Amino acid sequence: MKDEQLYYFEKSPVFKAMMHFSLPMMIGTLLSVIYGILNIYFIGFLEDSHMISAISLTLPVFAILMGLGNLFGVGAGTYISRLLGAKDYSKSKFVSSFSIYGGIALGLIVILVTLPFSDQIAAILGARGETLALTSNYLKVMFLSAPFVILFFILEQFARAIGAPMISMIGMLASVGLNIILDPILIFGFDLNVVGAALGTAISNVAAALFFIIYFMKNSDVVSVNIKLAKPNKEMLSEIFKIGIPAFLMSILMGFTGLVLNLFLAHYGNFAIASYGISFRLVQFPELIIMGLCEGVVPLIAYNFMANKGRMKDVIKAVIMSIGVIFVVCMIAVFTIGHHMVGLFTTDQAIVEMATFILKVTMASLLLNGIGFLFTGMLQATGQGRGATIMAILQGAIIIPVLFIMNALFGLTGVIWSLLIAESLCALAAMLIVYLLRDRLTVDTSELIEG
């Protein structure tokens, strides 16, 4: 490993190390918002609602591909960080090689089992009429690019795992930048419409994956792309998948709960959907910053879980304090200028009032949401597979019964408050799991929870 990477893992001031690992991840998570709207933005110029619907309907498929990337990326990435903390550099080469080629194989399987059934999958996603063929065509490109999409997510995680978060950010920036260039060329220049949008995203993922591969081949002595080293054993598979499977489940369940919430809101009409949509876009930015903060320090926690548990404790304290500061600043902003913030999106006073109310409730859950993110990341980093699995399931399962109960008792207001209640229960569950696992973590987590 490079001396600079070891410095941030082992010796730099805790806050400096936290920002070194987290800042690129924060920027990356914010870029993901841009990434998600690029295709719709360019397709919007064609003024064809069927094309916009086709792209929107494919989002669950992208979430699944991202989840498959996390299966190897998060699972192997946290394991690699722990191996580096234990100075077991040779084993990390075997882990990385197996995960890279395992991810590619998984992508090829996706092509085989989905490509022949793209029309049927489009129909399952809700495509009808003119939208069906457009959605199917978009899906075909997505399925064909699956190996590279999965590989991109794996390699991006590996860059952070070895202490090179800036490389991770550069890869994401390159992918988004190339997509911005390619989309208008393919959509308008070659008149490919939704297929052009899909190709722009696919080519961007291929380019980013190749960037990471070239970087690791030239600069890393702990991540290997040598297929001869892709030899798994029982211990390796256990360490990868006990964390990778919960990460995969979390990606899938988060998308599912979002779908369920939309169904509840749809019951109250466009007024409710529009109000929530505005508040969601406003709360999304601080939420993504906190998510980037918590995910960014996962390699730092994993490394010091093996190398220096006192430093690991200091990192967790620093993250909790940072989450608290972000929460206080956001709450002050919402309760002082929240009405004006919502007014930037609409002049409809009824929607402004409802969206402002929703914004206050959802922003109030930011602290608890952050604690949940941090402790889930901590369980992943330290290899606590059972705890991570329980948290992944709870984050998807808790909100559904809460939504049904609150909707039955209080209607739309209950649906809105269910978000805060569910986040509170998830945060309490995370604290309880970490407390119960305190002996395995060998760090005084009870002090963190009480303090």
Swiss-Prot record:
Location in or out of the cell: Cell membrane
Domain of life where this protein originates: Bacteria
Topology of the protein relative to the lipid bilayer: Multi-pass membrane protein
One family name in Pfam for this protein: MatE
UniProt record similarity statement: Belongs to the multi antimicrobial extrusion (MATE) (TC 2.A.66.1) family. MepA subfamily.
PANTHER family: MULTIDRUG EXPORT PROTEIN MEPA, SPORULATION PROTEIN YKVU
Induction annotation: Repressed by MepR.
Main location: membrane
The protein, known as: Multidrug export protein MepA
Known role: Multidrug resistance efflux protein. Contributes to resistance to the glycylcycline antibiotic tigecycline.
Stretches that traverse the bilayer: 26-46, 54-74, 97-117, 139-159, 170-190, 194-214, 245-265, 282-302, 318-338, 355-375, 397-417, 418-438
Gene Ontology BP term (one): response to antibiotic
Annotated GO CC locations: plasma membrane
Native species: Staphylococcus aureus (strain N315)
UniProt keyword terms in alphabetical order: Antibiotic resistance, Cell membrane, Membrane, Transmembrane, Transmembrane helix, Transport
Keyword check for Membrane: yes
GO terms assigned for molecular function: antiporter activity; xenobiotic transmembrane transporter activity
UniProt cross-references to InterPro entries, sorted A to Z: MATE_fam (IPR002528), MATE_MepA-like (IPR045070), MATE_MepA_subfamily (IPR051327), MdtK-like (IPR048279)
